[in-house]
Design a protein with these regions (language model features):
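Active-site glycine-rich loops that stabilize anionic/oxyanionic intermediates
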Residues: 23-27, 92, 208
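Flexible "cap/lid" loop of the alpha/beta hydrolase fold
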Residues: 107-142, 183-187
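Short beta-strand/loop motif that positions the catalytic acidic residue
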Residues: 198, 204-206
Length: 261
């Protein structure tokens, strides 16, 4: 059974549930720090799942072999168990999973935060390999990448801006876990999204201090879905954990209100 953190309840004002999908090396805990309570307090039912092999969600096979299709299946499982289709909100790899989910499933709306772009993670991997050639080579050879994050400096570089206190970076770094090697292949070439198949309205948010995906890539993601990206200039990749997380949550809330959700 998938780990699911479920807070708040649907209200007359907000009858549509929200389903949050985490990124690589993370789990449902990253949404439970701030976002779930924020949206529950604003009258929504807010749920975050841990994808299989993450957090408290078991996996029937080694995590290195889990695919993007497996993660999409997890989202389908949770979404179909809700009384009405949820808004799907994905961060980083979770944004990629949301894009794939929306190719074949209808949703009232979707939100992409610092998401893997539709063209995949090829440029990201090249940038990272140039920055850390030996750790990345080791990850590719062994299928294990968690060792890359043993340095708090790298955790901050990839996920957090300088505004995040060091104690918080260390606390979150301790919660990171292994990620699937198969997903790197899927998100590089094998299973790229098809934006033309998606009809769901999307809000695309990017971070100006993102150590994973560039502002240019955030704008390219938005263009692929016929919208414009909104950039939070001083934020790092983990927009839901950064000191300015509330401004991101408030923007999502106001946008959903404008969509009648």
């Amino acid at each position: 059974m998938l780990e699911l953190i479920d807070k708040g309840s649907c209200s007359d004002t907000h009858p549509t549930p929200l389903l949050f999908v985490h990124g690589g090396w993370h789990a449902a805990w990253c949404w439970d720090e701030h976002f779930l309570d924020f949206f529950a307090d604003n009258g929504y039912r807010a749920l975050a799942l841990s994808l299989r092999g993450h957090g408290g969600s078991p996996a029937a096979k080694p995590i290195r072999t889990i695919s993007i299709a497996d993660y999409v299946e997890d989202v389908v499982t949770v979404a179909e168990g809700l009384p009405t289709p949820p808004v799907v909100i994905g961060h980083s790899m979770g944004g990629f999973v949301v894009q794939k989910y929306l190719e074949t499933h209808q949703a009232p709306a979707g939100v992409l935060l610092a998401s893997i772009p539709p063209k995949g993670i090829g440029p990201f991997l090249m940038r990272w390999t140039k920055r850390q050639p030996w750790p990345m080579t080791r990850a590719l050879l062994t299928g294990k990448s968690l060792h890359i994050f043993r340095s708090p400096e790298i955790v901050r570089e990839k996920f957090f801006s300088q505004r995040t206190p060091e104690a918080e970076v260390l606390r979150y770094a301790a919660l990171l876990q292994e990620e699937s090697q198969r997903v790197s292949r899927d998100a590089s070439l094998l299973l790229l999204p098809h934006p033309e198949r998606v009809t769901t309205p999307l809000l695309v948010l990017g971070a100006g201090r993102d150590g994973c995906f560039t502002v240019k890539e955030a704008h390219a993601t938005a263009r692929a879905y016929g919208t414009e990206a909104e950039i939070f200039p001083d934020m790092g990749h983990n927009m839901m954990l950064e000191p300015g997380w509330a401004s991101v949550a408030e923007r999502i809330h106001s946008w959903m209100t404008s969509q009648g959700i």
